[in-house]
Amino acid sequence: MTATAPITQDVRTFPRKLPDGPVNLIGLTRDGLRAALIEAGTPEKQAKMRTGQIWQWLYQKGVRDFASMTNLSKDYRAMLAETFVADVPEVVSRQVSADGTRKYLVRIAGGHEVEVVYIPEVDRGTLCISSQVGCTLTCSFCHTGTQKLVRNLTAGEIIGQVMLARDDLDEWVPTGEGSDAKPRLVSNIVLMGMGEPLYNFENVRDAMKIAMDPEGISLSRRRITLSTSGVVPEIAKTAQEIGCQLAVSFHATTDDVRDKLVPINKRWPIADLLDALRDYPRVSNSERITFEYVMLKDVNDSDADARRLVQLIKGIPAKINLIPFNEWPGAPYERSDWARIEAFADIIYKAGYASPIRTPRGEDIMAACGQLKSATERARKSRKQIEAEAGL
């Protein structure tokens, strides 16, 4: 990431319709689904009702076989099967950590792969999903940043990660039962996987609106957290159009250090970022912003850093998540000593901010924060190759 990078990255997103193939309904907005049904011959007067019926099959019951959508006529189901598909990304491999964390390697159109992580806890289940193949930000402490950006994910590929996890966890509502028939295993979504979500804003927005829709997956916006490295111009739009919880990959208290750790800081330095964050809780009706802070030995973990951090965020409803650095092969940093992390947390706590220390999860399967990178990373492809695969 350089200081001259554009706000909207020049990265292709695969179309929902592959060459000479059917339209994939997964990822279409309600309006998009209705329009697709009308184009396929559904009378306009029936389109709203049909949209609602299909929506509930797809996103409440997890049924993607049109023949099983039994409240639709046989002829209508046959038309759907001839015209559309309802496909989610393919799970290539599934690893389960000793602590119960699950990591999925997922294949999408073009043969590219991303990673998805499910973290079970006593009172919640958090699904960490990706928004891009690779990443453009090159944050020096993050393994994902060493995998070059290939492309944005479509809305279908983003919400599809949620759906495949629910498949694996057997979380869908059985036909004939209410939406509260089963305990919710995926209770929270965090956009903290591969990629910068705000460089793929429209697709992330559409996918999260599907996740929040009350007739489908029905997650509260308070249970969805979008993590950004600080794409300042998109922060207000996130509050207005998504309204989810916001986390910021902060990681440093001076521009000199943050320029090295999070190079996007060269374009939007700390002062500009904090200015953009001050209005977010009010506009989005969120309780507070989460500041993520990775603890790097002798880099950003001094008492002076802790005191500066408290001063910087003064006046912003916030909590600070302290993240012990999760090492990966070739990493240029070390994790701060535990005593140092606790001392740092104590300074923040005494200043009146919650400062939980994140327990590393899934380290044995490289599923912890900052460790994600496609294990079978493909050879980099040229734009011409990507366009050819997409039928552009």
From Swiss-Prot:
One of its GO terms (molecular function) is tRNA binding. Its cofactor is [4Fe-4S] cluster. CDD domains: Radical_SAM. It comes from the Bacteria. It is found in: Cytoplasm. Belongs to the radical SAM superfamily. RlmN family. This is Dual-specificity RNA methyltransferase RlmN. It comes from Jannaschia sp. (strain CCS1).
